[in-house]
């Protein structure tokens, strides 16, 4: 394959990492004493990064195919992001949304001009963006559609939409809801990519008075096992929404901002949402979230929703740097080429171990390798073995390995990652 001019230009800038010596001794016991136990952490502590490489506190290097879970769009210490954040924090890092924030307006304009949206609301995370979408849907149902009954939002089984009470309720995975009753009312679930089940559910809920206010889906399910949406399914979803005055909402928190080889995941499906959300990769690792909508459903008024930190100058400067770099360096070309290369390499591994792996799937640089249900191996076991060999991966459920490297990953790094994975698997079988 041809070597992307994007990657050449990134490498030519020579990321400046001045000290790769081991950091001061890090004690996990001290960390665990003071930090709440909300993550099952792997036993390494990350000290610094450059491009697609991370170093731990002992000086060991790793190829980073987690990227903060699809968040470090430009990798680590990218000059454009470093420059944007450094310049902005010396000028103005935060001011209230009681005033106009030029960087926020500029970022909103860029997003609108490069998407199907007309308006943008900024917040700080994917969960917050999805909360904003849920509130917008409910207000639209009450004020525009004049619902007589409680609005219902349909989401997919095996979905993931966040960790707040509303978003774990929207998430179609009971394991995330356990112990958090009472959940937020107004949600129901259908199997992903199943047209008949969706049609039946809408018909059942709308019998008598309309109740379905929105259908809320991921274009590709990330936490649900890296499962791409089916074109025929999403075309029918759009038709159902149009025929029944139902809003179509897409959660693009993990797949948006070029991750799939297109700027937005919905571009793979041939339909446009009425509302969609973004976060993770939008500012390359600087906390940000965004909820976008078309003008007809922009029913928020002052006081309906807000965010203290949402759209602050620092996060918006970072977001602009990421998006302009994606566009200016033609990173989508690199994502498509490196994604094809990665899937080809994973397919070779699957063919080498036909009883261990069943499927390679994904778009661009979000890909999954599924482990056979008959195998005793789990995704976490392979993740640990790969980490020992110097490759960081993330599980997407107990039987799926997830590959989400930075969008600047090189041809050589993809080849190296595939070889490391091959070696790691060999230690387990």
Curated annotation (Swiss-Prot):
Activity: how regulated: N-acetylornithine aminotransferase activity is stimulated by the addition of Mg(2+), Ca(2+) or Mn(2+), and inhibited by the addition of Zn(2+), Cu(2+), Co(2+) or Ni(2+).
UniProt key word RNA-binding: no
Enzyme class label: transferase
UniProt keyword annotations, A-Z: Amino-acid biosynthesis, Aminotransferase, Arginine biosynthesis, Cytoplasm, Pyridoxal phosphate, Transferase
An example Gene Ontology biological process: L-arginine biosynthetic process
Coarse class of the protein's main subcellular location: cytoplasm
Cofactor: binding comment: Binds 1 pyridoxal phosphate per subunit.
UniProt keyword Amino-acid biosynthesis present: yes
Known EC number: 2.6.1.11
Additional remarks: May also have succinyldiaminopimelate aminotransferase activity, thus carrying out the corresponding step in lysine biosynthesis.
NCBIfam families: argD (TIGR00707), PRK01278.1 (NF002325)
HAMAP family: ArgD_aminotrans_3
Subunit structure: Homodimer.
Protein name: Acetylornithine aminotransferase
Biological source species: Synechocystis sp. (strain ATCC 27184 / PCC 6803 / Kazusa)
Upper lineage: Bacteria, Bacillati, Cyanobacteriota, Cyanophyceae, Synechococcales
């Amino acid at each position: 394959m041809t070597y992307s001019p994007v990657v050449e230009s990134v490498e030519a800038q020579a990321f400046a990492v001045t000290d790769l010596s081991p950091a001061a001794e890090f004690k996990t016991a001290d960390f665990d004493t003071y930090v709440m136990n909300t993550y099952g952490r792997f036993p390494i502590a990350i000290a610094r990064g450059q491009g697609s490489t991370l170093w731990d506190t002992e000086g060991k290097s790793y190829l980073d195919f987690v990227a903060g879970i699809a968040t470090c769009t430009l990798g680590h210490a990218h000059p454009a992001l470093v420059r944007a954040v450094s310049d902005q924090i010396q000028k103005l890092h935060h001011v209230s949304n009681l005033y106009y924030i030029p960087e926020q307006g500029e970022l909103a304009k860029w997003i609108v001009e490069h998407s199907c949206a007309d308006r943008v609301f900024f917040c700080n995370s994917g969960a917050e963006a999805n909360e904003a979408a849920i509130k917008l849907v409910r207000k639209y149902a009450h004020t525009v559609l004049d619902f007589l009954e409680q609005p219902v939002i349909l989401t997919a089984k095996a979905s993931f939409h966040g960790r707040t009470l509303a978003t774990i309720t929207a998430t179609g995975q009971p394991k995330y809801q356990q112990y958090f009753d009472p959940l937020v009312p107004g949600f129901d679930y259908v199997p992903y990519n199943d047209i008949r089940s969706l049609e039946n559910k809408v018909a059942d809920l709308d019998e008598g008075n309309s109740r379905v206010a929105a259908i809320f889906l991921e274009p590709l399910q990330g936490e649900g096992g890296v499962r791409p949406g089916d074109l025929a399914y999403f075309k029918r979803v759009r038709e159902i929404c149009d025929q029944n005055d139902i809003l179509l909402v897409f959660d693009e928190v993990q797949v948006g901002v070029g991750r799939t080889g297109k700027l937005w995941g919905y571009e793979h499906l041939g339909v446009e949402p009425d509302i969609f959300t973004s976060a993770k990769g939008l500012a390359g690792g600087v906390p940000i979230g965004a909820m976008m909508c078309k003008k007809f459903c922009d029913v928020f008024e002052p006081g309906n929703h807000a965010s203290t930190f949402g759209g602050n100058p620092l996060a918006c400067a970072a977001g602009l740097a990421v998006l302009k770099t994606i566009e200016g360096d033609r990173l989508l070309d690199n994502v498509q080429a490196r994604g094809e290369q990665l899937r080809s390499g994973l397919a070779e591994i699957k063919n080498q171990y036909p009883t261990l792996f069943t499927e390679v799937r994904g778009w661009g640089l979000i890909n999954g390798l599924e482990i056979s249900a008959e195998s005793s191996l789990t995704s976490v076991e392979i993740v640990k073995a790969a980490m020992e060999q110097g490759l960081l991966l993330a599980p997407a459920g107990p039987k799926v390995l997830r590959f989400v490297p930075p969008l600047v990953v090189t041809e050589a790094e993809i080849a190296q990652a595939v070889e490391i994975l091959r070696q790691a698997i060999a230690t387990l079988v």
